[in-house]
Amino acid sequence: NGVIQTELARLAVEHQVYLLAGSIPLKSAIMDKYYNAALMYAPDGNLLCAYNKIHLFKFNDGVVAYDEGVNFVAGDKVICCEIDGFKVGLSICYDLRFPELFRVMGVVDVILLPSAFTYQTGLAHWELLARARAVENQCYFVAVNQGGEHESGRKTYGHSLICDPWGEVLASCA
C-alpha cells in the first residue's frame, strides 16, 4: 500500500469507477526483483484484484535489446474478477502473444490488457493479436497501449483499441 496505490484508490472513489492501473512495479519476495502488476480498484476504493504479469518481455534485434527479467519476476496465477456481473480477465503487454494464458481464463466477458508495446513490435502485431484474442476467446478485448517517444529514445506504439468477439475493432485511438 504505497503512495501510488493510495492515489489510485482515491481516484476510483472520487470518480466512482472501476480503475485498472498497470503496469505498476510491486516488490516481490526476491531481492531487487519486482512484479509487473495490474491493479483493479472498485468504486469504493478497495483493491478488487491484482495480476502479476506471467510472460516477461525479452527482445534483441541486434540494435535494440531489452530483458524484463533483469528487474522483474514472473507471476504464476491467471486472474479474473467479477465487475457488476461481468467476468473480467486481466493480462499485461507481452502476455498478448500467448493464447494459452487467455484460454485458461475460461469463459470471460471481457479481457483487459494494459501495455507498452514497442513501436516495432506494435506495428507488426498489435492489432492482429488483439483481434485474434477476442475471436479465440469469444469476448470483448480492451487493449490499451502507451504511445510516444520516451526520454531514453524508446518509442511505444500506441493505437489502443476495443475489439468485439467477432474481432471487429469497435473503437481505437492513436
Predicted regions and their residues:
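Active-site catalytic loop in hydrolytic enzyme cores
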Residues: 6, 10, 29-106, 119-128
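Well-ordered beta-strand positions
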Residues: 25, 80-82, 161
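Short glycine/acidic-enriched loop and turn motifs that connect beta-strands
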Residues: 26-29, 149
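CN hydrolase (nitrilase-like) catalytic-core segments centered on the catalytic cysteine
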Residues: 2-21, 96-174
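Short Pro/Gly-enriched beta-strand edge/turn motifs at strand-loop
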Residues: 19-26, 58-65, 141-145
